[in-house]
Amino acid sequence: MIKLRLKRFGKKREVSYRIVATNSTSRRDGLPLEELGFYNPRTNETRLDVPAIVRRLQQGAQPTETVRSILRKAQIFEQLKA
């Protein structure tokens, strides 16, 4: 099963995350299938590759709870329904 999850990057106490598509059995920071975006919780900055995310969701990828809330804020699910 393909999951959309956060991959941790950065130094101690200066964490940022990349939103990636990865196999559900692989490690959190393992090799992803595809990088789909970036999220920095300290500055609340988010950059998303919307067409790639919509394509992965249509293929059946399951987002984690945190990624789902980020996608909901960016209104990705409305684009998926259209």
UniProtKB/Swiss-Prot annotation:
UniProt keyword terms in alphabetical order: Ribonucleoprotein, Ribosomal protein
A UniProt-annotated Pfam family: Ribosomal_S16
Cystine pairings recorded for this chain: none
Domain of life: Bacteria
Keyword Iron included in the entry's annotation: no
CC terms in the record's Gene Ontology section: cytoplasm; small ribosomal subunit
Biological process according to GO: translation
Claim: Methyltransferase is one of the keywords in the record: no
One Gene Ontology MF term: structural constituent of ribosome
Family: Belongs to the bacterial ribosomal protein bS16 family.
The protein, known as: Small ribosomal subunit protein bS16
Species, as recorded: Synechococcus elongatus (strain ATCC 33912 / PCC 7942 / FACHB-805) (Anacystis nidulans R2)
Gene: rpsP
